[in-house]
Amino acid sequence: MAPWPELENAQPNPGKFIEGASGPQSSIPAKDKEASKTNDNGTPVAKTELLPSYSALVLIEEHPEGTDPWDLPELQDTGIKWSERDTKGKTLCIFQGVGKFILLLGFLYLFVCSLDVLSSAFQLVGGKVAGQFFSNNSIMSNPVAGLVIGVLVTVMVQSSSTSSSIIVSMVASSLLTVRAAIPIIMGANIGTSITNTIVALMQAGDRNEFRRAFAGATVHDFFNWLSVFVLLPLEAATHYLEILTNLVLETFKFQNGEDAPDILKVITDPFTKLIIQLDKKVIQQIAMGDSAAQNKSLIKIWCKSITNVTEMNVTVPSTDNCTSPSYCWTDGIQTWTIQNVTQKENIAKCQHIFVNFSLPDLAVGIILLTVSLVVLCGCLIMIVKLLGSVLRGQVATVIKKTLNTDFPFPFAWLTGYLAILVGAGMTFIVQSSSVFTSAMTPLIGIGVISIERAYPLTLGSNIGTTTTAILAALASPGNTLRSSLQIALCHFFFNISGILLWYPIPFTRLPIRLAKGLGNISAKYRWFAVFYLIFFFFVTPLTVFGLSLAGWPVLVGVGVPIILLLLLVLCLRMLQFRCPRILPLKLRDWNFLPLWMHSLKPWDNVISLATTCFQRRCCCCCRVCCRVCCMVCGCKCCRCSKCCRDQGEEEEEKEQDIPVKASGAFDNAAMSKECQDEGKGQVEVLSMKALSNTTVF
């Protein structure tokens, strides 16, 4: 043991202490500073002086580490305890609890109904365009194009069930093969995860809540994307899903059965049908190539109609077209016969708001889209507020322990699989994975459910929605039973394969880590969440679809270099993180690139500038030009004019001008509490200088 243990880690590097420390600081503990601020000689001690080398404060004092933002918050009960209430207070508390529970159910009901109306609004806005995507059979044979078509169509109609029913109809009519339909099913699985991502945006008010909520929503996205990246090439090379589902259909003799029970629809349909009703057969007719369906409206007008079959005299080209010789005659000019003519007679109109309006589908869709988003946002805010007021103290502790605690050893590994079964069962009950994951998102945001527990619940919801599709396929007519059942089984085994890839082994649970990383970025730069939503669900699929229209050579020529570049960046990032010593000094960080290529800070400055364009005296053009120059330059010496800088940036520059030195061999690096408080900004500047932003854009 060293004779001076407090000097074991001393580094004889002169000039490390902060300039202005003119002498040794007192060894009096920081908590006694207020009582005595003199050293051993009785002279006043400067606030920036260092402790003497013989002080053991550095060995005793424990510096509190930063709290993990992913830790579930402690929901403390700040109200009056139950034991301290009188009879009147207890009665009032009971009525308040019952009232909050009723309000919670009411807002949850409106939340689910707004999701249904939102789906109808998306179908009115983009349903016909989605049907036209399916009508181009030459593009559908391309697996990559089929994948992005599935994403775009499901995003537009906000329902994987609708897109799946269109695919089943096309396969049953021999317009599409099962092999070509499998990539579309994979794309539909990705597109359905946009709903809970939109819901997570509503919690952007609080950074920590938004961090958890957005990560909990995007864990579904990353699971679907990663599964597609692995299984789509595998399916294109081996066709294992097609072969496996064929084997299942040949082994088991399936017969027509009853449809899946509509438990949630029974509750929500009476309300949503008063707002809007759609004729979803129009989208299927457009996808089947019926040109007459282009002029039809998706808004359902007549709900009751009867079919009359009457005998009528009709003209035919010749006697060969007559129904029978006895029912055929001619008047010298035309040939007549008697035929049964079927006429559809409308009896009663539907009872919804837009039944008597002559507005086009696009206008009605925009109105419903705006209203449903407002209601969705309001309901979500109220649900979060009510849950935050109810889930306090012992109630929150019990719920969090129930949801997030594992089974005792050695059965802890079974907890996640039980959560998968729970997620599948709940999704089967509500008949929609979007509803289940969207309802779970605010619970993740307020800290009731952890990301690690939300992940298996989300995987279970993927399984639950496919079991619903299988039951719906069993209720299909005889001519479409096999095709619809095979499509549903392909969807089922695709999700099972994804779970086998990304869940059983803990280190393969990449969606959790990726979602947490995206949650951290989105919490710091909240505009990035909107960018992620637009880029990955609209821009990328539309770009790939446009390249697919140009043919395979163009798609490969543009796509392969981009994929190789992304793989190169990923490999370099892994080497920087795991074993940077094997890399050249220049490649150990991203500072060799311009700042705008490896950091979101310049982009954040541009967006902040765009949102506060007219709040300062400096003209907008001057500020934009100055900021763009600094962004492109990436040099630390580059400075904008004073009028273009924020006040915070000017203060930060003043802090960065403080010279820094290292302590000598016999200088204690520990500072008193008072000195730490005074120099907190300086230490933060030092740490910011030491760390480089490795966020690759």
UniProtKB/Swiss-Prot annotation:
GO terms for molecular function: phosphate ion binding; sodium ion binding; sodium:phosphate symporter activity. One of its GO terms (cellular component) is apical plasma membrane. Glycans are attached at N295, N308, N321, N356. Pfam families: Na_Pi_cotrans (PF02690). It comes from the Eukaryota. It is found in: Apical cell membrane. Keywords: Cell membrane, Disulfide bond, Glycoprotein, Ion transport, Membrane, Sodium, Sodium transport, Symport, Transmembrane, Transmembrane helix, Transport. Optimum pH is 6.0. Induction: Up-regulated in the entire small intestine by low-phosphate diet. Up-regulated by metabolic acidosis. Disulfide bonds join C303-C350. Residues 1-91, 158-213, 385-408, 508-526, 573-696 are cytoplasmic. One of its GO terms (biological process) is phosphate ion transport. It catalyses: 3 Na(+)(out) + phosphate(out) = 3 Na(+)(in) + phosphate(in). Highly abundant in the ileum of small intestine, whereas it is almost absent in the duodenum and in the jejunum. Its main location: membrane. Residues 113-136, 235-363, 430-486, 548-551 are extracellular. The keyword Lipid metabolism does not apply. The chain crosses the membrane at residues 92-112, 137-157, 214-234, 364-384, 409-429, 487-507, 527-547, 552-572. Residues 1-45 are annotated as: Disordered. It is a multi-pass membrane protein. Belongs to the SLC34A transporter family. Involved in actively transporting phosphate into cells via Na(+) cotransport. This is Sodium-dependent phosphate transport protein 2B. The gene is Slc34a2.
